[in-house]
């Protein structure tokens, strides 16, 4: 045995391949050994894992309400090391939104977050995504009968009831208690909930509803609708804007609105965009209901990531809460956010 070991070591040194070489088949000197090869895997190596890709779909990309949501989504994507694509129709269009989402399903994206133009029109595409293994959540505007996992939003009904209580308070000493409602896309689940809840409080309290006018989430259309309503009802006592599209633009394009507000018409409006906050400070708007724009992107992307990566379960509805702005001082707090771009605090 010792003789063999010495002979083998001597041979290995002579061959220059060291003591780690494979054992010889016999004691006879073999031909020079090939260089040792790395062990080959029994299966093909796995491809490098690509970053997750989520599609975030607003009702319309031309609506400034969604700009802060986009910023939030981008910030969260950067933190998580994922990609979030901003995919939506230029203007509010449920059919176009569904087509864009179908294209994303075909690309096999990893998840979707959708603000639905219409709950029924978006239900089939949401269900197709879920059936294809693509998790879907909704934010801002829901499709409650779809297979979506959860809905991230303020409680639209609670916020609208609060808005109605404020309108009742503002008009309590006025003999004229007529009011009109401005809405966006007819049938949008979030807007319908706001209108219904507002009227459930306002009408029994003695306020007199005149009309509900849609503007299809379009700023210019909203301006025209409001001016036309005030032409038809110049003595309107109150205006509830379930979305404040006309207030996003140039107030000078609405001379009838300005005149009515200065004459005492009370305005309760959704959202806390920069123009609206300035109008509140000027006394042309009297209460603003603020949604968590930044959270529609930042928080909701985090929720979808938790679902996809961490397999976390969420309830059907996640309540964001809402902000209420009634005083110039409160308006200044949010104007500072617009100025600095810091919406995290």
Question: Language-model segments: what does each one mean?
Answer:
Residues 51-72, 76, 80, 85-101, ...:
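Extracytoplasmic "Venus flytrap"
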Residues 97, 152-178, 221-223, 272-276, ...:
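Hydrophobic alpha-helical segments within soluble ligand-binding/sensing domains
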Residues 65-79, 159-166, 189-207, 225, ...:
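Short, solvent-exposed amphipathic alpha-helices that sit
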Residues 28-36:
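Bacterial lipoprotein signal-peptidase II cleavage site
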Residues 111-131, 198, 216-279:
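Hydrophobic alpha-helical
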Residues 2-22:
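N-terminal secretory signal peptides and thylakoid transit peptides that target proteins
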Residues 50, 182, 186, 190, ...:
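Hinge/cleft segment of the Venus flytrap/periplasmic-binding protein
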Residues 119-158, 178, 273-281, 285-286, ...:
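Flexible loop/hinge segments that line or gate small-molecule binding clefts
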């Amino acid at each position: 045995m010792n003789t063999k070991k010495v002979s083998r070591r001597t041979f290995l040194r002579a061959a220059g391949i060291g003591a780690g070489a494979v054992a010889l088949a016999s004691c006879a000197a073999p031909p020079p050994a090939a260089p040792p090869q790395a062990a080959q895997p029994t299966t093909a190596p796995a491809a490098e894992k690509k970053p997750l890709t989520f599609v975030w779909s607003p009702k319309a990309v031309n609506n400034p309400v969604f700009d802060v949501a986009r910023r939030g989504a981008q910030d969260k994507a950067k933190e998580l090391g994922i990609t979030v694509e901003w995919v939506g129709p230029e203007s509010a269009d449920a059919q176009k939104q569904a087509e864009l989402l179908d294209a994303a399903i075909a690309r096999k994206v990893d998840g979707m977050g959708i603000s639905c133009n219409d709950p029924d029109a978006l239900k089939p595409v949401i269900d197709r995504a879920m059936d294809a293994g693509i998790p879907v959540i909704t934010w801002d505007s829901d499709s409650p009968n779809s297979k979506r996992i959860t809905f991230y939003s303020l409680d639209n009904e609670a916020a609208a009831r609060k808005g109605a209580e404020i309108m009742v308070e503002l008009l309590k000493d006025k003999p004229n208690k007529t009011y009109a409602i401005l809405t966006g896309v007819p049938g949008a689940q979030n807007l319908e909930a706001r209108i219904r809840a507002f009227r459930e409080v306002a009408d029994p309290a003695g306020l007199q509803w005149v009309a509900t006018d849609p503007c299809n989430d379009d700023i210019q259309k909203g301006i025209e609708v409001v001016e036309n309503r005030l032409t038809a009802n110049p003595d309107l006592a109150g205006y509830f804007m379930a979305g404040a599209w006309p207030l996003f633009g140039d107030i000078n394009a609405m001379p009838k609105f300005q005149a009515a507000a200065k004459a005492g018409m009370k305005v309760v409006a959704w959202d806390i965009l920069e123009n609206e906050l300035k109008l509140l400070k000027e006394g042309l708007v009297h209460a603003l209901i603020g949604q968590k724009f930044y959270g529609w992107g930042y928080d909701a992307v985090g929720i979808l990531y938790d679902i996809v990566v961490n397999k976390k379960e969420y309830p059907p509805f996640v309540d964001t809460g809402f902000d209420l702005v009634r005083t110039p001082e409160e308006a200044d707090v949010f104007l500072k956010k617009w100025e600095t771009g810091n919406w995290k605090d």
